């Protein structure tokens, strides 16, 4: 009986020790949440898209992440723009946003993560403006890790490449 009680308490502690206030900076490079579960191997029920295939350096585009059905809500995210392995650009998150916040992955506001998790804050669709650096040129891919629940998450879902054009 005591063993069952200890296991139950340990399970609750493990579930609440996931990152309830967003991804930590230590997740910036590999984008893997610190959950004691394996990455999903089935295709993600989410898309990451832009309305355009190119953007001028120094300009912004909207990046949209959507669940394919109303049941495909996001409890947590880590969103970055990458050129190769380098995290590039900056994100704008509204101060009124109850789901998201900027994250500094080596530079201010170069990633987006979730805020304190509460089931009623889960989202099916989110959108963020991304601004390309003024000196950037070439292809950028948007990558997102999506947490549906503590043990169900997908790492590094990629958008189609977006070409950053020089001035």
Swiss-Prot record:
Its main location: secreted. It is found in: Secreted. It comes from the Eukaryota. Residues 1-18 form the signal peptide. May have antimicrobial activity. Belongs to the insect defense protein family. This is Putative defense protein Hdd11-like. It comes from Samia ricini (Indian eri silkmoth).
């Amino acid at each position: 009986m005591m063993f069952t009680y200890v296991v139950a308490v340990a399970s609750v502690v493990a579930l609440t020790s996931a990152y309830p206030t967003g991804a930590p900076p230590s997740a910036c490079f590999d984008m893997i949440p610190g959950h004691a579960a394996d990455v999903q191997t089935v295709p993600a029920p989410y898309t990451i898209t832009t309305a355009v295939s190119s953007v001028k350096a120094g300009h912004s585009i909207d990046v949209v992440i959507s669940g394919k059905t109303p049941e495909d809500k996001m409890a947590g995210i880590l969103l970055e723009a990458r050129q190769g392995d380098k995290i590039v650009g900056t994100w704008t998150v509204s101060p009124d946003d109850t789901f998201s916040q900027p994250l500094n992955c080596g530079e201010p506001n170069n990633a987006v993560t979730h805020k304190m998790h509460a089931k009623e804050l889960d989202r099916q669709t989110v959108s963020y403006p991304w601004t390309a650096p003024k000196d950037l040129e070439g292809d950028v891919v948007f990558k997102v890790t999506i947490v549906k629940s503590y043990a169900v998450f997908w790492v590094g879902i990629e958008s189609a490449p977006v070409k950053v054009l020089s001035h």
